From Swiss-Prot:
Domain CID: 1-146
Disulfide partners: none
Pfam families in the cross-refs: CID
Organism: Dictyostelium discoideum (Social amoeba)
Classification via PANTHER family: NEOSIN, ISOFORM A, NUCLEAR RECEPTOR COACTIVATOR 5-RELATED
Protein name (record): Putative uncharacterized protein DDB_G0281733
Extent of Low complexity compositional bias: 272-354, 434-477, 817-831
Biased composition (Basic and acidic residues): 592-601, 611-813
Amino acid sequence: MDIFDSTITSFEDFPSERFKEQLESLTYESIERASQFVLENLPCIDDLFDVLLNRMRKSAYHKRLLFFNLIDCICIGCSRIENDVYKKFIINNVDEIIPLILPDDNLEVKKKNRETIERIIRSWSNNHVFNDTFISRAFSILSGVAKESRSICPNLSEKEIARLLKRMEEKRKDQNKKRLDLEDSHPLDEFLELWFNFNLDNSSSSSSSSSSSSSSSSTTTTTTTTSELSSISTSLNSIRTNSSCSNNNLQIDIEIIEKEKEKQKEHFNSFNDTSITTPSTSSSTTSSSSSSSSSSSSSSSSSSSSSSSSSSSSSSSSSSSSSSSSSSLDNSTTNDNNNNTSNNKNNNNDNYNNQSILEKERIYKLDYEVYDSFKSQFTIPEWPSYEIEDIDLFTSGNDGEYQDYIENEYNSFDQNSYLEYKKKYKNNEFENSIGNSNNYYNRNSSNNNNNNNNNNNNNNNNNNNNNNNNNNNNNNNEDSGNFMNSILNYCFYEHKNHFNFIKNNRNNHYPYNTSGYLNNRVDNYQPYSPKTTSDSHKLQEYFNKIDYMNKNGISVVDICAKSKSFEIPNICGADGGDSDRMDIDTNNSLKNENKQNDSHRGKSRKRRSSSRGESEHSRYYRDSSRDAKDRDSRDHRDNRDHRDSRDHRDRRDSRDHRDSRDYRDHRDSRDYRDSRDSRDSRDSRDRESRDSRDHRESRDSRDHRESRDSREYRESRDHRDHSRDSRDQYRDKDHRDSSDGRDHRNRDDKYQIDKRDNQHHNERNDSRNDRNDKNDKNDKNDKNDKNQEKYSERYHNERDSRDNEKDFYRSKETMVNNDNRSSSNRSSNRH
């Protein structure tokens, strides 16, 4: 490096930097010059080789062979001068240099490059540039590269690897988009599995707790009811878990059902023994007799009649009034009238109980989870007629008072008054009300099973039970996953039977509007009028709408799942009113219901304490009339408030509309005024420009006319002067002839005066002409300036366009030159 110390003055003077510049513009013609530069700088040949190898790594395939030819020239030049400094670098990096030249994606180029490399290596061996060991190693590397690729995937080219990576990236994006595939799975699968395992593990403990609770049921009526409900629920859970574990198709073991029915019968009998003695205390329990009455189907006719009579006494005093308990009550009264009809009733009861148990046993883990997920969206009522607790789609918001009224209505009647009303009631209508629910629960059974329901033999009843079990098992696949639908339909029909009983027995004393039970909105809540029959048809109209939904396959669950409120189509049109709308708001309904329940409990206590000496009927009539008055006044006040708010809203809307209309008119007028002003200003500006142009033209014409007049005047003056001069000459001649000195002097004076006047007049005309010429010149200069600006702008535009054209043609020429140069290079390479 000492050789270059005296010549290097800056960083750009280093050989490596200068060699980089040569490699950037390297061609086949400049290979010899670049190799000569390396030979001149042999002390730093390692740095120059490093620069060359880096350039090969970064360059494209079609340029790498050019760099290899440069290496060949350098090696041959060094061998000629017998300098071995090149061997060390080439021997150490030959494993990388040769594979860099062979492309993977183009077989033709790869074949040509391989032939060129083989020719260069043979020339090295012929000229003794490298020894034989290096030559054999180079050939082995060349043959190895021909068989294997230098890339990551040995069997793929670089383009194929790029395509593979692109496909992998697309698949990764698709997987990110499809993280949750909901087509073949349920969102609650994991929780369902945990819930199922938990119930499976705790089935034994729950059954033991149910047995202990059933043993303690004989102490008090309240504990009996809760223990019975817990035993029934745990037994149903055990049946559900056993059936779901044993068979995926949810087939139910009949023996397990019979065992559970016997257990329910024992609990039911024990409950009836206590409830007969204390009918008033059992009125505080809810939803117990309905589930217990379903267990009395497997006994004989005498035992079933006794159990049904006991159940009638208990259910009349209790607050629950499900279809099963209603059927048992009906059987007790018909036994007093006709023994033959009681056998048919028992058969119907057995079939009904079996069907209700089968409906319960169809509940499996997914249905229970769907039920639990829907529970939180609705109001949790204390409705006595439900066999299935903690669900109600009817009562929410303002209907809590109506619900409390119905509960107190049942609690306020004793057994005797109930039986008196029952005797007045027609048996056929009562049978029809129960028959609706029986027909509904027997909808999946065949015609043969329905015919067998009317038989009087217990053996036929057992066979019918078995047939119903088989039919329901066969239909499990059709109705799987529709547990919520069955529950809601069950509740609808229970409500229908319940309100048919109330409507037909107490229509004259019914203080509330049935539409209030259906509509939660205060503005739609109308007071009840017993004189008209329109209100009595509204409940039946509502249930007709529900029947229409069931017949046409409209799922109430789907409607409730999609939105918190749903509308049922108005198909009956008894009153010609609007369709009933049910708004379900969980938080508000729960708050309102709790407040109303608390307030109503206090009122009911006061009523009981104040009316102990009165009869149940008088207390009911007085309380109902008082409640009706309160309800009417409150409804009137609510309607008035609603009407006032609606009027206020209408006035506000009209005021807003008027303000918006005024603002729009004002805006339009302002825009019109602005446009008119702008148009007037534009017209005035045009008029001024036109006036200025006319003034300029008139001035030019006036100046031209004045100049013409002045020229004519000048010509006439010259002519007059000439005539005067000629006359003066004759006069002078006469004067000379007359030799009169006085005339000669007078003539000279006159001539001087005329000359002075003419001179003054000429000066004035000249000044005027000069002024006119000056004005003309100024106008001409203004026009010239404008034209010059216009021409200069046009000139600049033309010049820019010419420059762009020159650049375009220059770039085109360079492209053509480059193409010609590349073609010449290719032709030289071929030669």
